[in-house]
Amino acid sequence: MKTVLILLSILGMACALSMKNLNRRAKLEDSEENGVFKYRPQYYVYKHGYFYPALKRFAVQSSSDSSEENGNGDSSEEEEEEEETSNEEGNNGGNEDSDENEDEESEAENTTLSTTTLGYGEITPGTGDIGLAAIWLPRKAGATGKKATKEDESDEEEEEEEEEENEAEVDDNEQGINGTSSNSTEVDNGHGSSGGDNGEEDGEEESVTEANTEGITVAGETTTSPNGGFKPTTPHQEVYGTTPPPFGKITTPGEYEQTGTNEYDNGYEIYESENGDPRGDNYRAYEDEYSYYKGRGYDSYDGQDYYSHQ
């Protein structure tokens, strides 16, 4: 019992001291001096819980939890999944369906991805205003390999057909130039083409070429001249706007435009009137002296010899 009483007394004293210290701190913190010079902010749990909630509550700072912001993203993902499933179904279908789809896709790619560069503001003929329709999803390696092999085979077949058509056109042109084909002569004769027939054909070709050359010379009326086949030509008067003078005639100054013909006009720009102040110095202040000494010699002054009467 004694030990229990001793422990209780010790606990009471400790609690009393702690309460005194708390009361003193409360009184000191309420004073103006401690509020200014000894500010001790008290941290409480409810402040953190109230002023700093989880970021999900703020719509601005949310990254991927709000359904409003990611509505477009979810729809785009669904569209991509639908496209992938449709493509897989098309690939798993029959060979005819796959070939038709590949042809349509190749045509669409050719229309959407045009190689020509257009000017500013122009719209490509394939894309237009279709948004993201020109973007294609990547296919599997096996499908691309099959597609490449089929395209190579189709290209080779097209090249062979073009070569055959070109050869047929060349044969037709040769037959048209020669007039009559060798096959027709063989059928008519029954025993092959003879030398006389060939000679007649050669003669006809020569006559045709001679007639062509004669027609060209008559229509062209070519004439020879000592200057290597070229004639000296004079340009039309309308080209230069002026008539050239005849050969051997010398032009007079009156035929050209003359400036500064006026008494006071020295070719400067004139303001307000014909005899206005021009730009620059024309020595108008010395006009009287110049006119007075104009007809006199350098050695005379007032009609007398300057050096003899000195």
Swiss-Prot record:
Provenance organism: Bos taurus
Gene field: IBSP
Q: Where is composition skewed (Acidic residues) in this entry?
A: 75-87, 96-108, 152-174, 198-208
GO terms for biological process? Answer: bone mineralization; cell adhesion; cellular response to growth factor stimulus; extracellular matrix organization
| Bias-annotated ranges (Low complexity) | 62-74
Q: What does this protein do?
A: Binds tightly to hydroxyapatite. Appears to form an integral part of the mineralized matrix. Probably important to cell-matrix interaction. Promotes adhesion and migration of various cells via the alpha-V/beta-3 integrin receptor (ITGAV:ITGB3).
Q: Which residues carry this modification: Sulfotyrosine?
A: 306-307
Q: What is its main location?
A: secreted
Glycosylation-annotated residues? 110, 178, 183
Q: What else is known?
A: It is possible that the segments of clustered carboxyl groups mediate the strong binding to hydroxyapatite.
Q: What is the lineage of its organism?
A: Eukaryota, Metazoa, Chordata, Craniata, Vertebrata
**Which protein are we looking at?**
Integrin-binding sialoprotein
Signal peptide range in chain numbering: 1-16
